[in-house]
Amino acid sequence: MDKSLIELSEKFRAGQVNRREFIQRVVILAGGAAAAVPLLNQLGFDSTLIREANALGSNIETMDVEFPSGGDLIPAYLAKPLGPGPFRTMIVIHEIFGLSNFIKDVARLLARNNYLALAPCFSEGNCTGGLPDGKHAQWMLDTLQTGVARVPDDEQDKLRDAYAFLSKREDVDTDHIGSVGFCWGGARSFTFATLNPNLWAAVVFYGSTPPLDDLNNINSPVLALYGGLDNASPTSITGRAAETAREMRDRSPKPFEWEVYNQAVHGFFRAGTPPDDHVADTRPALIAKDLMFDFLDRYYDRG
């Protein structure tokens, strides 16, 4: 193996080279992403780095960014196709586990399909995808008991600020900024549709419903995807799916599309455990992925 690659890996492990620079330099030294992957394996790096190297060979770029919110800077992971754009854009909202490698993989999936994707870290102090710190335990308990997600005001503001940050970027198609979220983030994606009349589309993976009185504020089409093997109690996420569909029909002028995958558990779009969590390739996940892109394409065509 080239001595320069070994020296570079030692500098990365010592913190002298950041993650993005390390991956880019390995790809360059190896002569491309395809050649870099086995070298990273030989150097003993985990599959997360290997996926990021593969992403560099998929005509996309990734970067860490920040945007202001409430006097703080919110860290975020951004993935986009190569080129100036403007691109259709999605805010990717993480699970309660924070900005995990799974969520970054979702962002790269969107970028490979010609979207710009911004995945903010909305969990204070939990931007690496670890276990939740308990801050949201009461919120989760209340949501599971009632089947209704009441998102705190400060988190609503962070969603608005993420949208405002994207609206100022030249590579963003500002007429087509949507959101997609998973569980904790699914509830926030659904809620954001009630807060932002300019949101293009909202995709909800096994996320709870906002307060029913807020549904008439929705001005974007919503796609909701549920696992049939999720808790099926009347107030659970899946248990409320049919009621949500009825309420959306009666209260919102915009389309609400929903699917329940009978053999899918809660969290079916994610595979693996941290730090090796990633987008699943199971049948329900693949079908849901295709349905999501079909949904976004249809409502993009309709303007």
Residue map of PLM features:
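Short beta-strand/loop motif that positions the catalytic acidic residue
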Residues: 224-226
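Short beta-strand element of the alpha/beta-hydrolase
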Residues: 87-95
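N-terminal cap/lid segment of alpha/beta-hydrolase-fold proteins
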Residues: 50-83
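Alpha/beta-hydrolase active-site loop
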Residues: 138-170
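Primarily recognizes the serine-hydrolase "nucleophile elbow" in alpha/beta-hydrolase
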Residues: 160-219
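N-terminal secretory signal peptides
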Residues: 1-21
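N-terminal export signals
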Residues: 10, 19-46
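C-terminal catalytic histidine-bearing segment of alpha/beta-hydrolase fold enzymes
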Residues: 252-303
